[in-house]
Amino acid sequence: MGARPLTLLRALLLPLLAGAQAAIVFIKEPSSQDALQGRRALLRCEVEAPDPVHVYWLLNGVPVQDTERRFAQGSSLSFAAVDRLQDSGAFQCVARDNVTGEEVRSTNASFNIKWIEAGPVVLKHPASEAEIQPQTQVTLRCHIDGHPRPTYQWFRDGTPLSDDQSTHTVSSRERNLTLRPASPEHSGLYSCCAHNAFGQACSSQNFTLSVADESFARVVLAPQDVVVARNEEAMFHCQFSAQPPPSLQWVFEDETPITNRSRPPHLRRAVVFANGSLLLTQVRPRNAGVYRCIGQGQRGPPIVLEATLHLAEIEDMLPFEPRVFIAGDEERVTCPAPQGLPTPSVWWEHAGVPLPAHGRVHQKGLELVFVTIAESDTGVYTCHASNLAGQRRQDVNITVATVPTWLRKPQDSQLEEGKPGYLHCLTQATPKPTVIWYRNQMLISEDSRFEVSKNGTLRINSVEVYDGTLYRCVSSTPAGSIEAQARVQVLEKLKFTPPPQPQQCMEFDKEATVPCSATGREKPTVKWVRADGSSLPEWVTDNAGTLHFARVTRDDAGNYTCIASNEPQGQIRAHVQLTVAVFITFKVEPERTTVYQGHTALLRCEAQGDPKPLIQWKGKDRILDPTKLGPRMHIFQNGSLVIHDVAPEDSGSYTCIAGNSCNIRHTEAPLLVVDKPVMEDSEGPGSPPPYKMIQTIGLSVGAAVAYIIAVLGLMFYCKKRCKAKRLQKQPEGEEPEMECLNGGPLQNGQPSAEIQEEVALTSLGSGPPATNKRHSAGDRMHFPRASLQPITTLGKSEFGEVFLAKAQGVEEGATETLVLVKSLQSRDEQQQLDFRREVEMFGKLNHANVVRLLGLCREAEPHYMVLEYVDLGDLKQFLRISKNKDEKLKSQPLSTKQKVALCSQVALGMEHLSNNRFVHKDLAARNCLISAQRQVKVSALGLSKDVYNSEYYHFRQAWVPLRWMSPEAVLEGDFSTKSDVWAFGVLMWEVFTHGEMPHGGQADDEVLADLQAGKARLPQPEGCPSKLYRLMQRCWAPNPKDRPSFSEIASTLGDSPADSKQ
């Protein structure tokens, strides 16, 4: 290849290689901006790089040192108070790669600093006051300066000068006032004020112009502003001259004249002297204000001079944060001087001695300066501020940090499995070092397995086999860090892996195996023996710990022992009881059934097995409890389910679950409730011929008669059988229960007419019409207000009052029922819509873990929503009581298994709610109810006005549960099932902390800021398994799409073992 192609190739590759090495990228560069003198400002700089980078700032090419006023905040530069002199110039953000040394600089950024500064009014022309004569030109200059250039306004004796250019001209550019020609009428006190984008300032010293005219009053001595302490005296001096002598009068703000004969009530101690001076003794706050001295000559206008009396005051000083510095650096601490009048004087002291103006440690202005800080400078320094009103002081604790030194390094260790293990990391330094531990280069966070003590020792509460690895401890202070590592070898204990289940089942007449394995420091020998010491039958073999039954017999049942042993650790035993069982099979399985509305449905289910199986039904996503089914449903002893007076909402999938101590099986079938078709009286043109109709009727009747005969035969047989059983089992005088024989119910030994009719409906045959006994939903929900007897008020919600009441006849079979009543007392349209939304939600939901809507009172205002209530009240109070230290109030402590069960029930209720396309919006422990049987129901008490007011935050004209809300719900008003999932994660955290307030150490505004920044996370509760905390964290995923569904949550909680630590 020639030289020219090589040159071209090199020219193409070099930019690519250079681009590949430029790993540092500015995500946000500083930009020039406006700033106000003495106000806060921030130059932002954000860097992205694969390696650690060091970010610092330059001002006009010189590195910027941190001070109290100007300091680095992360990678940005923060200004507590912008200074137009010290902060003028070009700032640059510089990022240096600590690994490669690469350095990247941002573009220049500067401040356009806006300011205004007061100054005096001075005579510019003529050269001196003595040269001022009538008819001469007089020019005054206002020495107020600022940026941008201010606009000026001139005053004579406190009155703004008009724009009349015949007597004077104003030059804003030169800041001049020119009087041409000057006359006695121009005499007076001249002042100026100016304003710009920063603010306004007035002249600090005014000019008294006196143009000679003996009859005009001229100022000889003008009063000055006075600042005095409370109860001290104040003196104003004021003199005029004229021929004849002028009059002089003092007035206060309310224009009331002050004389020695007549004084205002609040100036009883005022004295006016013959020379015109005004004395105020024992000054009170009410005496502060503007005093005017008015001089009037024989001719000319009156001259009004003003002076203000201020009471001295001084504010409290802001406290210091403790400061930690590194030896050898230059450090500065600025004293936050308090506001005061007059301006307080500030000085620093150390050990009661004021600091000098020069030296290694000295005071410069408000700053405490350490030219080169040393370890001996550690101590308490005091900033003092003082004026006429008193003195203030604040201490700052300064610590000079040192690099840690070793007291005891971690050592390679052998730790026994299952016992506590310790690794020591003992160091000393100033301040006390911070110690962190790493396991396999991964940071160890404290949880139920690991603890780091205050002296740096790592405790492994229960050593596991996989804890055998490399550990590293790092001890650090701001001055630096040291580290050391140690390897842990775990001495494994002799144990079964896994322990055999103490009770196991084998299927009769089938092949079966029972495994048993163990591990230890040396591989153990594993064998099986019968518990009674007898030898194993010849058809049973023991193959290295696996018990093999070629064909299980009844005699194989019994107690067996697995023995594992090795030489150094001895032996361990596990006892197993083997049961020989006939696994469950279904004799009769439920079939797809179609039933007319208002009729009776029969779902047959029979199972067999040994031990005899028990049958349960599951319908509409909940287990049907035989004791709580109500009059419409009944489960017979043989397992069949009958539903009377069926309604469309009974449609759905029904599951028959058969189980015994050895196995469980289930089968399901759908139930469809349809409207009964209307039969036409007259034949249409398409009607079948008469003989076809007769043939159809004959076949139908014949089939029905045959079926009835078969059913009656079975009923007669089963009736005798059941009567015999009842005679054997039932106590004397007990009423026989309704039973079901192969799906046919009996009442007092007679077949039910409803069941006979149901048979025809199931097969969609024609039968006699039946009256639908169900009322419309609106009629069914109406409940008379007179049947409610209020008991006690629970609190107030956004809608209105929430109270407990006794409701008469609200539930079938109960005379009185304890209910929760929510009233709608608000006129707000949105709250009325929300009230109707809750009514619709609880009216449509039907789940064991969601409260039921029992009735509505709408015949008068306020409207009432009558909801189901349970005996122990809301879950929040229950959790708090379970943690209460008062033994009289404390309930049984909650185990991890019970906490998981509580969360699982809420998840099941929310799964049902979300499957029906509803969003709760306020899911929390306070809005769930719990019974004495620990059954939890999702509700919506919403006691935001009083009881739980602290758990709500007023945001955008509404009270919201801020600490339970997802970022998109708070900031965008986007409520969804995924925002309910976020709230469920917080509810789980409440359960495991026994009802603590989420983010309890933060104010509402801080929680809102964390939500906006995406940092709102709750810590892992004490004793909470890591697996469950990871589930909480998934619920708090920033992206709603990354959060689990309630179905997944319910499944995860259902699979969680009570003692899970992973």
Curated annotation (Swiss-Prot):
Disulfide bonds join 45-93, 142-192, 238-293, 335-383, 425-473, 516-562, 605-656. It comes from Mus musculus. The record marks 613-614 as: Cleavage. Interacts with CTNNB1. It is a single-pass type I membrane protein. Residues 23-112, 120-210, 217-309, 301-399, 404-489, 495-578, 570-672 form the Ig-like C2-type domain. Residues 728-750, 1039-1062 are annotated as: Disordered. This is Inactive tyrosine-protein kinase 7. Inactive tyrosine kinase involved in Wnt signaling pathway. Component of both the non-canonical (also known as the Wnt/planar cell polarity signaling) and the canonical Wnt signaling pathway. Functions in cell adhesion, cell migration, cell polarity, proliferation, actin cytoskeleton reorganization and apoptosis. Has a role in embryogenesis, epithelial tissue organization and angiogenesis. InterPro entries: Cell_Adh-Cytoskel_Orgn, Ig-like_dom, Ig-like_dom_sf, Ig-like_fold, Ig_I-set, Ig_sub, Ig_sub2, Ig_V-set. Pfam families: I-set, Ig_3, PK_Tyr_Ser-Thr. Expressed at high levels in lung and un-pregnant uterus among adult tissues, and in the tail, limbs, somites, gut and craniofacial regions among embryonic tissues. Residues 788-1058 form the Protein kinase domain. Gene3D superfamilies: Immunoglobulins, Phosphorylase Kinase, domain 1, Transferase(Phosphotransferase) domain 1. Belongs to the protein kinase superfamily. Tyr protein kinase family. Insulin receptor subfamily. Keywords: Cell adhesion, Cell junction, Disulfide bond, Glycoprotein, Immunoglobulin domain, Membrane, Phosphoprotein, Receptor, Repeat, Signal, Transmembrane, Transmembrane helix, Wnt signaling pathway. Residues 786-1062 are annotated as: Interaction with CTNNB1. GO terms for cellular component: cell-cell junction; cytosol; intracellular membrane-bounded organelle; membrane; plasma membrane. Residues 23-696 are extracellular. Glycans are attached at residues 98, 108, 176, 206, 260, 275, 397, 455, 559, 638. MMP14 cleaves PTK7 between Pro-613 and Leu-614 generating an N-terminal soluble (70 kDa) fragment and a membrane C-terminal (50 kDa) fragment. Proteolysis by MMP14 regulates PTK7 function in non-canonical Wnt signaling pathway. The keyword Repeat applies. The modification Phosphoserine is found at residue 1056.
